[in-house]
Amino acid sequence: MNTKLLYRLARNLRFYKKDLIIVIISLLSVSLALLLIGNVFRNLVDQGLVLDRTAAVDKSILYICLLIIILSIASFFRSYFINNVAEKVSSQIRKEAYSNLINYEITEFEELKIGDIISRLTSDIDQISKLIVNFLSFFIRNSVMLVGSIILMFFESFKLASIVIITIPLLLIPIIKFGKHVKALSKKTLESQSLLASDINESFSNIKTIHAFGGQAAKITEFNNLLQDYLTYSAARLKIRALFFAFSMAFIFLGVTLVIWIGALDIVKGNLSSGQIISFIYYAIIAGFSSGGIFELLSEMHLPLAALERIVTIIDKSPIVHNNYSDLKPVNSISLEFKNVNFSYPSRPNLKILNNISFKIDSTQFIGIVGRSGSGKSTLMQLLLRFYVQESGIILVNNQDIALLNPNEIRKLIAYVPQEASIFSGTIKSNIMFGNDSSEEEITEIIKITGIADFTDKIPDGINAKIGEKGVRLSGGQKQRIALARALLRKPQILLLDEAMNALDSQSEQKLLSSIRDIMKGKIVISIAHRISSIESADNILIIDKGAVEAEGTHAHLLKTSDLYRTIYKEVDLL
């Protein structure tokens, strides 16, 4: 058993001391009531049945009824409070894990699968809840009852109790033998469960593509293979646990049978009374079930402990914190500059994306960026947002190196609209307001400017309409208008548009661009364009090729001087 992990869990439990005290008192009450019933059985037999005393029988039955009432009440408090604590602790751990995960550096998510994250934050934490209930409730209760029943057995018969004591340590053999295998299989089971979650998430996120390409059969086969892996590991783990439990129970009750045989011989010889052997058998059965329950829980704990370990790795992996950031100096006009910047993605270190790129953008400029796919256009925005760190070179905002500035302060200056509009489940209004604290008047104005009012006026509930997960009820153009409204409502100093209007027709795009330029006067707009027509009016256009600026200038200038620009223009805009 991993005591370090249990200690980590105990740190979360310390906040619920009052509840745990009630749980412990309830557990002790349950255990004591069950153990006292054995003593009442002895009196019932020896004083009531053997001596034929009706009063003794009635008194014993009354005691048993009272103990059952105590047992029931204590069981209620135990069950309610331990499950309540388990839910609270699980929620607390889930909150810690989520809060830590969402603050990870973007690079960390290149190594994580969304399905794995979902699995850890849901099913793994549910396993932790089971661990709390099983350990604090059943494990402690069984331990108290085992110790208590053994002590009482010694009071009844030292010889018979000694036989029971000898058998219990022998059960450690299968625990040691099977434990390592169960632990390894538990980890494999959780990993295969995460792969299943990842596949489900991937499949239904791309359900339209699967249908369009007739890929249902292939995806079903892939899912079934993953499911078979999960079932294989799960079945192997359950088989070992079942063998262990069967061995344990057989061993325990063979021991109880041996005790009954020897005890019966002692009754014949007059060394034990009938009440003593009945009481002893009762305690022996309690000891048998308690020890069997303990060993069953020990074999079962490997799965929740493996789940706890997977969650702890998320919580313990602290985001990078810097306390020596420089303050961002306020200036009247914003400026931006890349100086000899080189970059490769961490997952593809041998593939150069940006190659010694340099350019400067002054305030009030509308900058267009064009280039072939994979030339590094979007990467420029990723670096400016500090999602990644360049290998060499300097990126300056207001003549300050952004490597020395707090990334959150830089992001406050920027509004970013990616190629695929990021839409959250909720309403149109909640999506527009995401990250913004704006008045109703500002929201009303921005939905008019971005053309959102054109379709919200025609639907029930307007901007308060529910749009489904990832905006499934919206068209591509509607999603992009919402993403643009969110960005403009932020009132940024720098607006980054990464093919942000490619789902709109040319006329709508031009109208929206005109509105954006009016709103962003005196600020910087950088637009990566698929259609050159959308940036023809830009103050300056950068042509990115193989990670460097191949040429720059106005649309008219580049048409005259750049072969690459003319080629792209003909390929895209004149088709």
UniProtKB/Swiss-Prot annotation:
**Binding of ATP, residues:** 371-378
Q: Does the keyword Transmembrane helix apply?
A: yes
- The main place the protein resides is membrane
Domain (ABC transporter): give its ranges: 336-571
Pfam families annotated for this entry? Answer: ABC_membrane, ABC_tran
- Annotated localization: Cell inner membrane
Q: Membrane topology for this entry?
A: Multi-pass membrane protein
Q: Name one GO cellular component term.
A: plasma membrane
Tell me where the transmembrane regions lie: 21-41, 61-81, 135-155, 158-178, 242-262, 277-297
Q: Which SUPFAM superfamilies match?
A: ABC transporter transmembrane region (SSF90123), P-loop containing nucleoside triphosphate hydrolases (SSF52540)
Recorded E.C. number(s)? Answer: 7.-.-.-
Give the Gene Ontology MF terms in alphabetical order: ABC-type oligopeptide transporter activity; ATP binding; ATP hydrolysis activity
Domain ABC transmembrane type-1: where? 20-303
Record's keyword terms, sorted? ATP-binding, Cell inner membrane, Cell membrane, Membrane, Nucleotide-binding, Translocase, Transmembrane, Transmembrane helix, Transport
Spell out the family assignment given in the record's similarity comment: Belongs to the ABC transporter superfamily.
Q: How does it assemble?
A: Homodimer.
Name the job this protein performs. Part of an ABC transporter complex. Transmembrane domains (TMD) form a pore in the inner membrane and the ATP-binding domain (NBD) is responsible for energy generation.
User: Domain description from the entry?
Assistant: The ATP-binding domain (NBD) and the transmembrane domain (TMD) are fused.
What PANTHER family does the annotation carry?
ATP-BINDING CASSETTE SUB-FAMILY B MEMBER 10, MITOCHONDRIAL (PTHR43394:SF1), ATP-DEPENDENT PERMEASE MDL1, MITOCHONDRIAL (PTHR43394)
Q: Output this protein's name.
A: Putative export ATP-binding/permease protein RBE_0492
Taxonomic source organism:
Rickettsia bellii (strain RML369-C)
